């Protein structure tokens, strides 16, 4: 089975956790896209749900497949957030944001009673950091913000490139109008300390470390198994 097939299987399993009249957080990324498509099929069959999308792209996809969507302003409390991850590490700590929606993804996850992660087995790791950590920053004073990020990394013994994410010849811009630095630090042994230190930098809007938010992960395995993992399983 290829990776795309595994993503579809994880997304299909996630539908078993969705019930009528649920208020759903709907994620962003390739695995979330598969979930949206399958959710649309269930809605067409009569499932009643309302979603809050974590990006403009996911909202457009929901509308395309017939999934009713609203905003957090209209529905500030959600029952279940279903989203992918770039890495799933110990104690269900995640790296997210490869799709550029990390700020909204974290807001929606925090507004949800539970967060369910859907992924293929390649996303499960013993130590976070092989995937670049996205750091969303305000465009104002970016060189100063970058310097402070580098200082945080140095203080925590992290080394590696910090690269401004590009979209062609221009910086990639998030739905919130911010830019993203991708930090290639390789191995993040103290994610909570790093999280706190990054958020203490005034120019940092958010980062892609998620801890204390996900309660379960559905992981599709290459051998055909689908595992439902709790934080205690890591």
From Swiss-Prot:
Q: What does this protein do?
A: Catalyzes the reversible conversion of ribose-5-phosphate to ribulose 5-phosphate.
Q: Which SUPFAM superfamilies match?
A: D-ribose-5-phosphate isomerase (RpiA), lid domain (SSF75445), NagB/RpiA/CoA transferase-like (SSF100950)
Output the superkingdom of the source species: Bacteria
Which reaction is recorded as catalysed by this protein?
A: aldehydo-D-ribose 5-phosphate = D-ribulose 5-phosphate
What is the protein name given in its UniProt record? Ribose-5-phosphate isomerase A
Q: Which GO terms describe its biological process?
A: D-ribose metabolic process; pentose-phosphate shunt, non-oxidative branch
Pathway assignment: Carbohydrate degradation; pentose phosphate pathway; D-ribose 5-phosphate from D-ribulose 5-phosphate (non-oxidative stage): step 1/1
Tell me what gene encodes this: rpiA
Binding residues for substrate: 28-31, 83-86, 96-99, 123
Which source organism does the UniProt entry give?
Bartonella quintana (strain Toulouse) (Rochalimaea quintana)
Family annotation (InterPro entries): NagB/RpiA_transferase-like, Ribose5P_isomerase_typA_subgr, Ribose5P_isomerase_type_A
């Amino acid at each position: 089975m290829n990776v795309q097939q595994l993503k579809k299987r994880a997304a299909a399993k996630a539908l078993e956790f969705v019930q009528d009249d649920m208020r759903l957080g709907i994620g962003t990324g390739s695995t979330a896209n598969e979930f949206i498509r399958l959710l649309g099929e269930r809605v067409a069959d009569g499932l009643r749900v309302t979603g809050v999308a974590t990006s403009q792209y996911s909202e457009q996809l929901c509308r395309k497949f017939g999934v009713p969507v609203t905003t957090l302003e209209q529905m500030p409390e959600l029952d279940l957030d279903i989203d992918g991850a770039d890495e799933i590490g110990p104690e269900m700590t995640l790296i997210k944001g490869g799709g550029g929606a990390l700020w909204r993804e974290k807001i929606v996850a925090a507004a949800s009673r539970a967060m369910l992660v859907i992924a293929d087995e390649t996303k499960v790791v013993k130590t976070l950091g092989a995937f670049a950590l996205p750091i969303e920053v305000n465009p104002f004073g970016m060189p100063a913000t970058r310097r402070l990020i580098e200082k945080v990394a140095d203080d925590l013994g992290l080394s590696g490139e910090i690269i401004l994410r590009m979209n062609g010849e221009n910086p990639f811009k998030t739905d919130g109008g911010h830019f993203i630095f991708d930090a290639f630090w390789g191995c993040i042994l103290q994610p909570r300390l790093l999280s706190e230190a990054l958020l203490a930098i005034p120019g940092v809007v958010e980062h892609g470390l998620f801890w204390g938010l996900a309660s379960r992960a559905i992981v599709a395995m290459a051998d055909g198994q689908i595992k439902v993992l709790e934080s205690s399983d890591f």
